[in-house]
Amino acid sequence: NKKIQLRYHPLNTTVLTDEKWLVFVLEQILSNALKYTKSGSIHIYLSPDAPKTLVIEDTGIGIAPEDLPRIFEKGYTGCNGRADKRSTGIGLYLCRQIMEKLSHTIRIESEMGVGTKVYLGLDTVSL
């Protein structure tokens, strides 16, 4: 059993994108956050510093610094203590490919034992 608090701040924003593919990317990112967060929180919000950026932040195990440069490579699974987790190394690769095709961006910051932040740079129109 996991004890995770999901915090979502409703966004008063319209995203100019292909909904199907953006949902796929969000599902992949949230799946990883849930997989690698034993307890704590997952927080989804628009960045106050970059209002066109959606942030998915978790308090999971984090990603080792040596793995960060390669996490978007096809088939790369990393080795930061996740041997018990099943991974094909295809999810983040697909996320980057999709985001680039949609003219969006994706980047990740992470610290071992603290958690991970995924930044999705989106074209937006404020309502």
Where on the chain are the PLM-derived regions?
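Conserved micro-motifs of the catalytic ATP-binding
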Residues: 10, 14-17
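Short helix-loop "hinge" at the ATP-lid/N-box region of the Bergerat-fold HATPase_c
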Residues: 33-34
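Short beta-strand/loop element within the Bergerat-fold HATPase_c
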Residues: 41-51
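Acidic ATP/Mg2+-coordinating residue in the GHKL
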Residues: 58
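Short conserved segment of the HATPase_c
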Residues: 63-76
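Short alpha-helical Gxxx[C/S/T] motif in the catalytic ATP-binding
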Residues: 91, 95
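Conserved glycine-rich
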Residues: 103-104
